[in-house]
């Protein structure tokens, strides 16, 4: 449900594994392909703790942090989603074929690219919007400057998702990107509780989105909403609604998504208007 609400959702998805996993709460975990040993351990530990708390892990099947995130989830008995920049039959990198097979058994592989599509450079940034779009938030474990992980973080912000980053030392070779994200407003993560605390509102609202798609129910958007009360025929931006309601940004974005799904609000260039 969350992916459908981004401004440029994929027209179709090819899935290998269990597609129902895509409907369930996920945390995106990304970072450097040339990850440090400390970052690999951090990714595996945090992802294991996340799945123990009921989240699935979403990442990109790349070397480094992506692989550590997937493995951390699997070792903890959880499920993980790998979003690919190739066709569903083209595993990249090739050394991750066994990892991909394991992911497909408990979670799934997913891509918007047709079977047979090779790993083209310009497909990776497009893939990143799906990683963030499927997820409640994005955790950047390690990132230098520049880094593709920062593209994913930027896309997450545009989609109204929470962004998290680990606070490395300024002397850590792969930590500059994370420090910049924290400077720019990302939530600093010292343990998994920092993530879970922020994702609570988004987690609950995703369940309401799912229930709304199943048919009539008690979705949050159907109840009296302070956001709906504030919207008229002039567009209001999410930032304006955050200030006016005093609600967390994640909750505002989640409620707007639920209201949009129900047809009660319309997204436009200036923000949102009441339908």
Predicted regions and their residues:
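Glycine-biased, small-residue-rich flexible motifs in mid-sequence functional cores and linkers
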Residues: 1-275
């Amino acid at each position: 449900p969350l992916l459908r609400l981004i401004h440029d959702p994929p027209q179709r998805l090819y899935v290998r594994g269990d597609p129902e996993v895509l409907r369930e709460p996920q945390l995106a975990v990304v970072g450097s392909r040339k990850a440090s040993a400390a970052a690999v351990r951090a990714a595996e530990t945090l992802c294991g703790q996340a799945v123990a708390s009921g989240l699935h892990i979403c990442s990109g099947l790349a070397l480094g942090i992506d692989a550590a995130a997937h493995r951390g989830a699997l070792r903890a008995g959880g499920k993980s989603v790998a979003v690919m920049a190739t066709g569903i039959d083209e595993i990249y990198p090739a050394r991750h074929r066994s990892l991909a097979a394991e992911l497909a058994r408990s979670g799934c592989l997913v891509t918007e690219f047709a079977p047979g599509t090779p790993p083209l450079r310009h497909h990776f940034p497009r893939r990143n919007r799906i990683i963030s779009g499927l997820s409640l938030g994005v955790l950047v474990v390690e990132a230098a400057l520049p880094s593709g992980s920062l593209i994913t973080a930027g896309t997450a912000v545009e989609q109204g998702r929470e962004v998290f980053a680990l606070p490395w030392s300024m002397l850590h070779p792969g930590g500059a990107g994370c420090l910049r994200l924290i400077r720019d407003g990302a939530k600093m993560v010292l343990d998994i509780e920092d993530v879970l605390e922020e994702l609570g509102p988004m987690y609950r609202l995703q369940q309401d989105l799912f229930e709304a798609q199943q048919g009539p129910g008690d979705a949050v958007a159907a109840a009296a909403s302070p956001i709906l009360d504030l919207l008229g025929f002039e567009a209001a931006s999410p930032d304006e609604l955050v200030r006016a309601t005093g609600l967390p940004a994640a909750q505002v974005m989640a409620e707007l998504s639920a209201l949009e799904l129900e047809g009660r609000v319309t997204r436009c260039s200036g923000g949102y208007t009441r339908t």
